Amino acid sequence: LSPAALACALDNLQRLGLQHKVQLTQADLFADGRAALIVCNPPWLPARPSSPLEAAIYDPDSRMLRGFLSGLAAHLVPGGEGWLILSDLAEHLGLRTRAELEAWIAAAGLQVLARLDIRPTHGKASDKADPLHAARAQETTSLWRLAAL
Protein backbone atom coordinates (compact mmCIF):
# COMPACT_ATOMS: atom_id res chain seq x y z
CA LEU A 1 0.00 0.00 0.00
CA SER A 2 1.45 3.31 -0.99
CA PRO A 3 1.67 6.09 1.61
CA ALA A 4 -0.43 8.25 -0.75
CA ALA A 5 -3.21 5.65 -0.82
CA LEU A 6 -3.19 5.44 2.98
CA ALA A 7 -3.35 9.24 3.26
CA CYS A 8 -6.26 9.31 0.80
CA ALA A 9 -8.13 6.66 2.81
CA LEU A 10 -7.57 8.65 6.02
CA ASP A 11 -8.78 11.84 4.34
CA ASN A 12 -11.95 10.06 3.19
CA LEU A 13 -12.58 8.70 6.70
CA GLN A 14 -12.11 12.16 8.21
CA ARG A 15 -14.50 13.76 5.72
CA LEU A 16 -17.09 11.10 6.60
CA GLY A 17 -16.46 11.48 10.34
CA LEU A 18 -15.48 7.82 10.65
CA GLN A 19 -11.79 8.14 11.55
CA HIS A 20 -12.45 6.98 15.14
CA LYS A 21 -14.36 3.88 14.03
CA VAL A 22 -11.88 2.51 11.49
CA GLN A 23 -8.27 1.50 11.95
CA LEU A 24 -6.08 1.87 8.88
CA THR A 25 -3.06 -0.40 8.77
CA GLN A 26 -0.21 -0.23 6.28
CA ALA A 27 0.72 -3.80 5.35
CA ASP A 28 1.84 -5.79 2.34
CA LEU A 29 -1.60 -7.37 1.98
CA PHE A 30 -2.82 -8.51 5.40
CA ALA A 31 -1.91 -7.16 8.81
CA ASP A 32 -1.02 -9.62 11.55
CA GLY A 33 -3.96 -11.19 13.33
CA ARG A 34 -7.61 -11.51 12.40
CA ALA A 35 -10.41 -9.01 11.81
CA ALA A 36 -14.19 -8.99 11.63
CA LEU A 37 -14.13 -7.02 8.37
CA ILE A 38 -11.41 -6.79 5.74
CA VAL A 39 -12.01 -4.55 2.71
CA CYS A 40 -10.03 -4.82 -0.52
CA ASN A 41 -10.30 -2.62 -3.60
CA PRO A 42 -7.58 -4.11 -5.80
CA PRO A 43 -6.45 -2.79 -9.17
CA TRP A 44 -9.14 -3.83 -11.63
CA LEU A 45 -7.20 -4.83 -14.73
CA PRO A 46 -4.87 -7.86 -14.93
CA ALA A 47 -1.98 -6.19 -16.77
CA ARG A 48 1.51 -4.91 -16.03
CA PRO A 49 1.81 -1.25 -14.94
CA SER A 50 4.44 0.92 -16.59
CA SER A 51 4.42 3.66 -13.91
CA PRO A 52 3.61 4.02 -10.19
CA LEU A 53 0.33 5.73 -11.10
CA GLU A 54 -0.73 2.75 -13.23
CA ALA A 55 -0.14 0.42 -10.25
CA ALA A 56 -3.53 1.60 -8.97
CA ILE A 57 -5.17 0.30 -12.16
CA TYR A 58 -3.14 -2.74 -13.22
CA ASP A 59 -2.61 -5.99 -11.28
CA PRO A 60 -0.10 -8.24 -13.10
CA ASP A 61 -1.58 -11.75 -13.48
CA SER A 62 -4.26 -10.75 -10.92
CA ARG A 63 -1.66 -11.39 -8.19
CA MET A 64 -3.15 -9.01 -5.63
CA LEU A 65 -6.69 -10.19 -6.28
CA ARG A 66 -5.73 -13.86 -6.03
CA GLY A 67 -3.55 -13.17 -2.97
CA PHE A 68 -6.41 -11.41 -1.20
CA LEU A 69 -8.82 -14.23 -1.93
CA SER A 70 -6.40 -17.02 -0.98
CA GLY A 71 -5.42 -15.39 2.33
CA LEU A 72 -8.76 -13.95 3.40
CA ALA A 73 -10.20 -16.91 5.33
CA ALA A 74 -7.07 -17.18 7.50
CA HIS A 75 -7.37 -13.51 8.50
CA LEU A 76 -11.07 -13.37 9.39
CA VAL A 77 -12.49 -13.97 12.87
CA PRO A 78 -15.29 -16.57 12.96
CA GLY A 79 -18.32 -14.97 11.34
CA GLY A 80 -16.16 -12.23 9.78
CA GLU A 81 -16.54 -10.90 6.26
CA GLY A 82 -14.26 -9.83 3.46
CA TRP A 83 -15.56 -7.12 1.17
CA LEU A 84 -14.13 -7.11 -2.34
CA ILE A 85 -14.80 -4.02 -4.46
CA LEU A 86 -14.24 -4.92 -8.09
CA SER A 87 -15.27 -3.69 -11.51
CA ASP A 88 -16.14 -6.19 -14.23
CA LEU A 89 -14.36 -4.02 -16.83
CA ALA A 90 -11.67 -6.73 -17.20
CA GLU A 91 -14.42 -9.19 -18.16
CA HIS A 92 -15.79 -6.85 -20.83
CA LEU A 93 -12.27 -6.37 -22.20
CA GLY A 94 -11.66 -10.15 -22.33
CA LEU A 95 -8.86 -9.98 -19.73
CA ARG A 96 -10.55 -12.13 -17.09
CA THR A 97 -13.75 -14.17 -16.97
CA ARG A 98 -16.41 -14.26 -14.28
CA ALA A 99 -15.84 -18.03 -14.11
CA GLU A 100 -12.15 -17.44 -13.22
CA LEU A 101 -13.10 -15.06 -10.41
CA GLU A 102 -15.71 -17.46 -9.04
CA ALA A 103 -13.22 -20.35 -9.24
CA TRP A 104 -10.63 -18.34 -7.25
CA ILE A 105 -13.28 -17.58 -4.62
CA ALA A 106 -14.25 -21.25 -4.33
CA ALA A 107 -10.62 -22.46 -4.31
CA ALA A 108 -9.92 -20.09 -1.40
CA GLY A 109 -12.62 -21.77 0.68
CA LEU A 110 -14.88 -18.73 0.51
CA GLN A 111 -18.56 -18.26 -0.14
CA VAL A 112 -20.36 -15.27 -1.59
CA LEU A 113 -22.86 -13.98 0.97
CA ALA A 114 -24.18 -11.25 -1.31
CA ARG A 115 -23.17 -8.98 -4.15
CA LEU A 116 -24.21 -5.35 -4.49
CA ASP A 117 -23.87 -3.88 -7.99
CA ILE A 118 -23.77 -0.32 -9.25
CA ARG A 119 -23.40 1.08 -12.75
CA PRO A 120 -20.91 3.93 -13.17
CA THR A 121 -22.16 7.42 -13.82
CA HIS A 122 -18.79 9.08 -14.53
CA GLY A 123 -18.19 10.78 -17.87
CA LYS A 124 -16.17 7.95 -19.42
CA ALA A 125 -19.14 5.59 -19.12
CA SER A 126 -21.05 7.70 -21.65
CA ASP A 127 -18.19 9.16 -23.71
CA LYS A 128 -18.59 7.60 -27.16
CA ALA A 129 -15.19 9.02 -28.18
CA ASP A 130 -13.46 6.92 -25.48
CA PRO A 131 -11.75 3.93 -27.14
CA LEU A 132 -13.09 1.73 -24.32
CA HIS A 133 -16.65 3.08 -24.58
CA ALA A 134 -18.25 -0.25 -25.52
CA ALA A 135 -16.77 -1.96 -22.46
CA ARG A 136 -17.32 0.99 -20.11
CA ALA A 137 -20.96 1.28 -21.17
CA GLN A 138 -21.52 -2.28 -19.87
CA GLU A 139 -19.30 -1.99 -16.77
CA THR A 140 -20.64 -2.77 -13.32
CA THR A 141 -18.75 -2.24 -10.07
CA SER A 142 -19.62 -4.75 -7.37
CA LEU A 143 -19.20 -5.13 -3.64
CA TRP A 144 -18.71 -8.86 -3.06
CA ARG A 145 -19.48 -9.88 0.54
CA LEU A 146 -17.32 -12.95 1.21
CA ALA A 147 -17.01 -15.31 4.17
CA ALA A 148 -15.09 -18.47 4.96
CA LEU A 149 -16.95 -21.72 4.36
Region roles according to the model:
Residues 3-145:
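S-adenosylmethionine
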